[in-house]
């Protein structure tokens, strides 16, 4: 199969000699334009690809040099094999690269570190031993093995032990003092080095170089977490679409009280995201709270009725970025034009928790410190609830410090001890439980989740806005 591919690839090159190489930056001159669509909110895949290529280069130019210098690392080695990619993979590769190529070894070297000169993008060498240049972001090292001319294939790819020998040569040429590897007991995002790859490196490099290995946990963690202003602007558009979709879902355009089930809304969301060319990173959920009934009485898939409080947990994925949102709605009873005051007060308590979270989240603080500060302020306001926020971006549950878990409100050892950094995003996820007089003081949970941006200046803001009014199902449009 590989030989057949090589032959076909050679024929393709003969027919279209200017064709762009697979996984490299797209050539805008080639291939017909995508079919027109009135429902493609983020443009064509080709347009998204060009944008992502620009983001990739700028992210590596902007964030990686100071991170390597801050963490005292002059070389960072990231080896992986096809279908067993390191979690940092999507943060350092182009959008056309879905998996590692056979074995791919990415090497980053700070050539200015020895002289202790000011760090800049020009200081960092980016080398790919296997795979491609990712649109010119990396310098490729290929094999010297000759290839039979009859195949029409390009220069051979590195393979097997040859890759480790090539890595050893790269290291010996540069003589790094500290070599970062992705190994961690605490963070999944920084534990991408497999046992087999570590063994393979060790056998070839020997103690001379393996003695310089360091588990630099925060280097990949913070690189994955860091976002550009250009990505912030795109994320705002993603969030605006999520708001539009939740408002439509929680309306009379979709819900027929007495007929529509919660599962109907779940699959409406899945279908709507798919129809718009979007992805999602988790199965959405929709739940109901009802006066005089407990959740186990409602069942797993209740029919929505007038007077219900509705809640959704939804997200979309576009251009490798993810959203995570929870909104709430009230189904009007006949003759009602608004939700009961007690339900609005319950939402206001959740809003107060959001205020606390936004005000207490700032660079340099750990997730556990932020959690403690928020819980203290909740106690001062007599608000009952829980806080369980997480970073978001390249992953839905993203890289960085957790701010609580729903079942760990005393702090999260390890994962809550990392520090917030500038230019990262959070899903501010929480719930406030409030007795509602109109429901005979039955406790009602208002669970909310809105995405928040921490700018390069350390200031926080909502990616778009936060919900401070219940959506009303049955209200006149």
Put a short name on every predicted segment.
Residues 1-4:
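Positively charged n-region of N-terminal signal peptides that target proteins for export
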Residues 6-16:
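Bacterial N-terminal signal peptides
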Residues 18-22:
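Sec/Tat signal peptide C-region and signal peptidase I cleavage site
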Residues 23-477:
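Active-site neighborhoods and metal-handling regions in enzymes and metal-associated proteins
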């Amino acid at each position: 199969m590989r030989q057949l591919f090589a032959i076909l690839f050679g024929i393709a090159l003969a027919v279209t000699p200017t064709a762009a190489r697979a996984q490299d930056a797209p050539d805008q001159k080639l291939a017909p334009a995508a079919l027109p669509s009135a429902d493609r909110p983020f443009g064509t895949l080709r347009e998204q690809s060009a944008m992502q290529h620009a983001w990739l280069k700028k992210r590596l130019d902007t964030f990686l040099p100071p991170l390597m210098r801050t963490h005292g690392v002059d070389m960072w080695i990231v080896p992986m094999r096809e279908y067993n990619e390191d979690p940092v993979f999507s943060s350092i590769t182009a959008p056309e690269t879905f998996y590692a190529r056979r074995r791919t070894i990415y090497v980053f070297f700070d050539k200015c570190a020895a002289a202790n000169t000011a760090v800049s993008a020009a200081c960092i060498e980016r080398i790919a031993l296997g795979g491609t240049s990712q649109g010119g972001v990396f310098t490729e090292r290929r094999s010297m093995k000759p290839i039979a001319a009859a195949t029409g294939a390009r220069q051979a790819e590195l393979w097997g032990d040859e890759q480790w020998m090539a890595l050893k040569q790269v290291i010996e040429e540069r003589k790094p003092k500290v070599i970062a590897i992705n190994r961690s007991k605490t963070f999944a995002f920084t534990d991408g080095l497999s046992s087999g790859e570590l063994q393979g490196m060790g056998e070839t490099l020997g103690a001379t170089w393996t003695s310089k290995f360091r588990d630099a946990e925060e280097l990949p963690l913070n690189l994955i977490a860091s976002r550009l202003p250009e990505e912030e602007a795109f994320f705002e558009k993603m969030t605006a679409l999520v708001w539009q979709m939740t408002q439509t879902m929680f309306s009379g355009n979709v819900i027929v009280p007495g007929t529509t089930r919660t599962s109907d809304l779940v699959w409406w969301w899945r279908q709507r995201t798919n129809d718009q060319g979007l992805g999602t990173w988790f199965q959405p959920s929709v739940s109901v709270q009802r006066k005089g009934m407990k959740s186990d009485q409602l069942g797993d898939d209740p029919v929505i009725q007038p007077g219900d409080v509705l809640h959704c947990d939804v997200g979309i994925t576009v251009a490798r970025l993810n959203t995570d949102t929870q909104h709430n709605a009230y189904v009007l009873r006949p003759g009602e034009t608004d939700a009961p005051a007690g339900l609005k007060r319950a939402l206001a308590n959740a809003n107060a928790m959001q205020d606390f979270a936004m005000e207490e989240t700032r660079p340099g603080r750990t997730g556990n410190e932020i959690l403690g500060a928020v819980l203290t302020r909740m106690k001062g306001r007599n608000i009952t609830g829980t806080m369980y926020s997480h970073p978001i971006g390249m992953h839905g549950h993203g890289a960085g410090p957790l701010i609580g878990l729903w079942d760990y409100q005393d702090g999260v050892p390890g994962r809550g001890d990392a520090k917030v950094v500038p230019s990262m995003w959070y899903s501010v996820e929480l719930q406030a439980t409030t007795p509602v007089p109109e429901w005979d003081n039955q406790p009602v949970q208002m669970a909310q989740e809105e995405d928040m941006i921490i700018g390069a200046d350390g200031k926080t803001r909502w990616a778009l806005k936060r919900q401070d009014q219940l959506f009303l199902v049955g209200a006149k449009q």
